[in-house]
């Protein structure tokens, strides 16, 4: 129920209250006047009774008893008027108290509804933040997998190119060695035919062997994959998103997302979580 409906219902209940209070106050005033009139009459009768009672032989026994009964009746009337006035005052008090209790109950009910709505809104807000955190973590994992896959493909391509280069170098080296060996054998046969000269052993150039061996056995180191300069950075380490991350529940947090390891977490904590900077700022307040 909205506050406007509460107010409207309460004003409807108060609409007849002034009329009832006015009627009760008028009756109380009339009863008070009657009681005061009775008390004045009692004073007058009492003075007259005491005056005649003081005179010797001025009042008979029957007259004295009659005057006493009259004074007693006046006292009864005054008491009746006073009792009616007290009852009417109690009734008026209960009438006002009823409206006050009704207002208190309506206010308590209205406050309960406000707190319930606030709790519901807070729960929905936390659920939205949690969903954003899970989505951010999922996107971070997907981005990390894509980067690893791209890096692996690039390393594989460079490895294949290096292998092809090494194979070409080895083939060239082997071909050179074969041709030189053939020349050596031809020269040796010629020397033998000419007069039995000693055979020459033709050695392959050591520098060529060393260069071929180095090219075949020491491929170039794989370079690190370059980082996209346009990718946003997070956390206290100012690095890109990777692995498990947690979001700060302070909506004004300048960093917003943090790596678990950088803030000393292994699992997501229950309830709200604030980063170290926001925690210090909250303590200062």
Curated annotation (Swiss-Prot):
Zn(2+) 2 binds at residues 248, 253, 275, 278. Its main location: nucleus. Residues 116-225 are annotated as: Disordered. The keyword Zinc-finger applies. Belongs to the ING family. It is found in: Nucleus; Chromosome. Keywords: Chromatin regulator, Chromosome, Metal-binding, Nucleus, Zinc, Zinc-finger. One of its GO terms (cellular component) is nucleus. The keyword Metal-binding applies. Zn(2+) 1 binds at residues 235, 237, 259, 262. Gene3D superfamilies: 6.10.140.1740, Zinc/RING finger domain, C3HC4 (zinc finger) (3.30.40.10). GO terms for molecular function: acetyltransferase activator activity; methylated histone binding; zinc ion binding. Pfam families: ING. Residues 131-149 have a biased composition (Basic residues). Residues 160-178 have a biased composition (Low complexity). Component of the Enok complex composed of at least Br140, enok, Eaf6 and Ing5. It comes from the Eukaryota. The record marks 234, 245, 249, 257 as: Histone H3K4me3 binding. This is Inhibitor of growth protein 5.
